[in-house]
């Protein structure tokens, strides 16, 4: 179902597209992928509801159940894993989320990288964060320019900025502090 103007696009699935009025070069596989798409180009969506709300966003890649589901106009985002970048919305560009529920609540932040299930899970608007490891930067909401490498590194950080935590549970209890460097366990 959906529109009929599928210029250079491949679409497979039930109710898989919006109107695709001027959209080109899109690949969609799964139920309700690209349900709102109008003019976004060169997107890839694989998995139920992936890129479901995308209207004009360009060059996004979503693989997994509801990956990048809320994206409407964001560009150059990559989400791999169920619920990865689920709530990302207008104005969120150049984000990469790999792992189940990574960056699930991000709405408008740019340039974030999350690798690991539930990494950067609570992020809403921060930018330029790097989280690698299960639950790294888990509760970070608006803190920017943080680097967390290791399981639960910077786990409790909410608004602290420009921190570097390397190692499992490094800077575990930091919530708002900034400009810290920790290497090793908590």
What positions do the PLM features span?
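Glycine- and small/polar-enriched repetitive beta-structure motifs of secreted/surface proteins
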Residues: 1-186
């Amino acid at each position: 179902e959906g529109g009929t103007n599928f210029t250079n696009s491949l679409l497979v699935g039930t109710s898989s597209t919006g109107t695709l009025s001027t959209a080109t070069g899109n690949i969609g596989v799964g139920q309700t992928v690209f349900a709102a798409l109008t003019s976004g180009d060169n997107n890839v969506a694989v998995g139920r509801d992936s890129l479901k709300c995308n209207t004009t966003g360009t060059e996004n890649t979503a693989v997994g159940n509801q990956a990048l589901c809320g994206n409407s106009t964001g560009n150059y985002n990559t989400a791999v894993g169920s619920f990865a970048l689920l709530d990302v919305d207008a104005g969120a560009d150049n984000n990469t989320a790999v792992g189940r529920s990574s960056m699930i609540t991000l709405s408008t932040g740019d340039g974030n990288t999350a690798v690991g299930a539930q990494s950067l899970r609570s992020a809403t608007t921060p930018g330029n964060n790097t989280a690698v490891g299960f639950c790294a930067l888990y509760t970070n909401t608006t803190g920017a320019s943080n680097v967390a490498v290791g399981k639960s590194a910077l786990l409790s950080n909410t608004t602290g900025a420009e921190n570097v935590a390397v190692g499992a549970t490094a800077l575990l209890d930091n919530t708002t502090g900034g400009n810290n460097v920790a290497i090793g366990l908590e």
